[in-house]
Amino acid sequence: MAEVLKGKPVADALKAELTKNIEALKKDKGITPKLGIIRVGARPDDLFYEGGAKKTCAAVGMDCEIFEYPEDIDQASFEKAVTEVGAKKDVNGILMFSPLPKNLDERKIRTLIPVEKDVDCLTTGGAAKVFTDDATGFPPCTPTACMEMLHFYDIPIKGKKCVVVGRSLVVGKPLAMLLLREHGTVTICHSRTENLPGVCQDADILIAAVGRAKMVKADFVKKGQIVIDVGINADPDRPGKYCGDVDFETVEPVVTKITPVPAGVGSVTTSVLCKQTFMACQMQNA
């Protein structure tokens, strides 16, 4: 039986440290960090994450402001709105939910978010900082949450074979960069990789971030491995439930350590979002 690596203890530790740091910032400089959330429409997934972010902000003593716009907002009006949010001096970090409605040019709108307030790597400038090892850039929250999980559970990365299944700019590619920073030997693969199960079996640390329910099965893994499951998918076998990219029931008996879905990496992301907003606030007020 594998050790199941839950996300809650990681999130709790991050929040405890962040609460102390925010209290110190308030005392020393009279500044309260603020997260600004930009949302168009009211998709249930966006509202769910927004609720979690607001709750985490409140728990650590951080302000949070929601900037909500109708789904039929036009391009010019939304560009003006995003520019105004970006210019607010009291907003230190910005999260914008995507995808935006099809009538909006999302690529152009992302350029309007100030890079120094881009706490979820939405902008090209933010991504450039991550991929050039610029410490003033913020990686997306999900890959950062993966790294927080590895650190909290004292899982060594240096010299280890790290296989990332998934090549998105949201998780796979930035996660590979974060693992490389800590001297992991990284392989990025995807659903079309030749002999994907064999490549995955060669890993010391296997991270599934491909967005396919239960794709990673027992023949992808071996004894001694650590498996981090980033996926969040509708469970094809249990209507109304969620599952990861890993078939937990068949993989868990084989490997040494594994994260569950839900209650794994996903439960750490809002704490990371708040941490990166605090860091942005520090840099803006240095």
Swiss-Prot record:
Keyword Membrane: no
Binding-site residues for NADP(+), renumbered to this chain: G166, R167, S168, S191, I232
Catalytic activity reported: (6R)-5,10-methylene-5,6,7,8-tetrahydrofolate + NADP(+) = (6R)-5,10-methenyltetrahydrofolate + NADPH; (6R)-5,10-methenyltetrahydrofolate + H2O = (6R)-10-formyltetrahydrofolate + H(+)
UniProt-listed GO biological process terms: L-histidine biosynthetic process; methionine biosynthetic process; purine nucleotide biosynthetic process; tetrahydrofolate interconversion
Keywords: Amino-acid biosynthesis, Histidine biosynthesis, Hydrolase, Methionine biosynthesis, Multifunctional enzyme, NADP, One-carbon metabolism, Oxidoreductase, Purine biosynthesis
Single GO cellular component term: cytosol
Record-listed E.C. numbers: 1.5.1.5, 3.5.4.9
GO MF term set: methenyltetrahydrofolate cyclohydrolase activity; methylenetetrahydrofolate dehydrogenase (NADP+) activity
A Pfam match: THF_DHG_CYH_C
InterPro entries: Aminoacid_DH-like_N_sf, NAD(P)-bd_dom_sf, THF_DH/CycHdrlase, THF_DH/CycHdrlase_cat_dom, THF_DH/CycHdrlase_NAD-bd_dom
Pathway info: One-carbon metabolism; tetrahydrofolate interconversion
Function: Catalyzes the oxidation of 5,10-methylenetetrahydrofolate to 5,10-methenyltetrahydrofolate and then the hydrolysis of 5,10-methenyltetrahydrofolate to 10-formyltetrahydrofolate.
Protein name, entry field: Bifunctional protein FolD
Protein source organism: Desulforapulum autotrophicum (strain ATCC 43914 / DSM 3382 / VKM B-1955 / HRM2) (Desulfobacterium autotrophicum)
Chain's gene name: folD
